[in-house]
């Protein structure tokens, strides 16, 4: 018994040290908050530069916490957002960078942040031009969207982005169903601004398809 106590103490200390060393999702919370502020409150003409500034901050988190999927996912989200804001060849180059980072996160943990890497990667495949300019691929996009929904079937983002994709593919009835499901998604603690902005996007898209169907 006397030999067992030191062993148990050593195991406890190892577990405690590992828990203290493991990075927390809270590390990326400031990135999440700032991203939502840029997307939903900043003028469109300023967003590319603001996303660029934010990407530098999230890269620092990734560098300081290697193999931490949430940081890689948010790096991919921010860089892909900058790509969309810039457009053109510069945006395409950024989209390729975002794709690489998101793929890295999936190799580490495909379930991190409820499969958010699948959602963001699917959106890139859906919106980036196809060959020879880019890597866009509608079939690949749908495969990834379905994986994102498998990981987070009731989430606001996977349902919104897949619904938007289906509407772009002229599968309006299917797309409407996913948009309506996205509106019913449970609020995300600490993501109030992002949820509010996303719901507005959903409602706008639903109104657009309602008008188009008349």
Please identify what each model-predicted range represents:
Residues 19-57:
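N-terminal leader/linker segments that initiate helical-solenoid repeat arrays
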Residues 56-63, 103-107, 143-150, 184:
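Conserved structural position within tetratricopeptide repeats
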Residues 31, 36-43, 81-90, 113, ...:
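Short coil/turn linking the two alpha-helices of tandem helical-hairpin repeats
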Residues 44-59, 91-100, 133-139, 179:
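Helix-turn-helix repeat elements of alpha-solenoid scaffolds
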Residues 71, 114-117, 158, 192:
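TPR alpha-solenoid repeat register
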Residues 66, 110-112, 153:
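Short coil turns that delineate tetratricopeptide repeat
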């Amino acid at each position: 018994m006397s030999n067992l106590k030191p062993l148990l103490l050593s195991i406890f200390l190892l577990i405690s040290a590992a828990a203290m060393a493991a990075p927390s999702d809270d590390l990326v919370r400031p990135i999440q908050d700032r991203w939502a502020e840029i997307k939903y409150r900043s003028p469109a003409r300023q967003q590319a530069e603001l996303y660029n500034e934010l990407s530098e901050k999230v890269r620092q988190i990734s560098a300081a916490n290697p193999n931490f999927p949430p940081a890689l996912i948010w790096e991919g989200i921010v860089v892909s957002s900058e790509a969309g804001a810039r457009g053109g060849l510069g945006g395409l180059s950024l989209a390729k960078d975002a794709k690489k980072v998101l793929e890295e996160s999936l190799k580490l943990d495909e379930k991190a942040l409820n499969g958010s890497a699948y959602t963001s990667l699917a959106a890139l495949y859906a919106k980036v031009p196809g060959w020879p300019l880019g890597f866009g691929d509608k079939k690949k996009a749908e495969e990834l969207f379905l994986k994102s929904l498998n990981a987070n079937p009731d989430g606001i983002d996977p349902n919104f982005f897949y619904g938007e994709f289906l509407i772009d593919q002229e599968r309006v009835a299917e797309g409407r169903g996913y948009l309506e499901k996205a509106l019913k998604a449970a609020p995300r603690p600490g993501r109030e601004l992002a949820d509010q902005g996303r719901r507005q996007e959903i409602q706008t898209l639903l109104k657009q398809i309602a008008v188009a169907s008349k």
